[in-house]
Amino acid sequence: RDLVRSRGLGDVYKRQGNGQAEGKADMKNLLGGKGANLAEMNLIGVPVPPGFTITTEVCTEYNEMGQEKVVALLKGEVESAIARVEELMSSKFGDIENPLLVSVRSGARASMPGMMDTILNLGLNDEVVEGLTRKTGNARFAWDSYRRFVQMYGDVVLGMKPTNKEDIDPFEAIIEEVKHAKGVKLDNELEVEDLKELVKKFKAAVKEQTGKDFPACAYEQLWGAVCAVFNSWMNERAILYRKMESIPDEWGTAVNVQAMVFGNMGETSATGVCFSRDAGTGEDLFNGEYLINAQGEDVVAGIRTPQQITK
């Protein structure tokens, strides 16, 4: 039985073919909502970054068998799937000179509060960030991506994000401290040296709070993120929501791993959220908003005012 379903050109068994994907839209039970729809988008010719989906069945087995056994069973399939993404992106996961970075997202059958937040830019470390700088000629982009990754990974995988509104996110406190010292108001006003300082302070906070160094190995980072998705299925908030909505625990969640596409490379890149229908009326009206030189959750986080995609 396949535990990993690939998207992009070909599948986990490296079959070739433009616009091919193992999954499709009606496979939400196995691939989750995101995984099934990403596969369908690929099949109809939408340019979707290559990646793969670890199925919902693995989540169930993870909760029954435990982390160690499931990771051992999955290891070969995931490494094979990563190798296929490397081939398609002409880059290598964890490589210093030509790095492949990925995103990791949860993907239940239906959107569900309490599930793991997205992790972007996975695969960076102190050496890879220098390689990314050389590869792109853009030091600010490389270090901005790195500081975002350490914060996301620390918050989500290492459990450093506050669970209530009274507690302060240690990473946000550091950002505010550095911005105040620099005399700026916005994150995108920070310069390369400021971003390097953020990374250094972020990693020190990780060491202080967890007692361990921030993981430098790309595969260690990946397995940490994958297991965090599965663990989030059984967290208190997710369990409570499932009880309220009569969603069985056995459904599980899928994990989606995709090659990164960057919105923070400068004034010619952006991140956005869009809808094919009006959310209030259902009218066939394309709408959404975007932020230039930003990434991920910036659009909905209220850091800067986004622009309307239809203007």
Predicted segments with their positions:
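Single conserved hydrophobic/aromatic residue that forms the stacking wall/gate
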Residues: 1-13
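Nucleotide/phosphate-binding sheet-loop regions of phosphoryl- and nucleotidyl-transfer enzymes
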Residues: 11-311
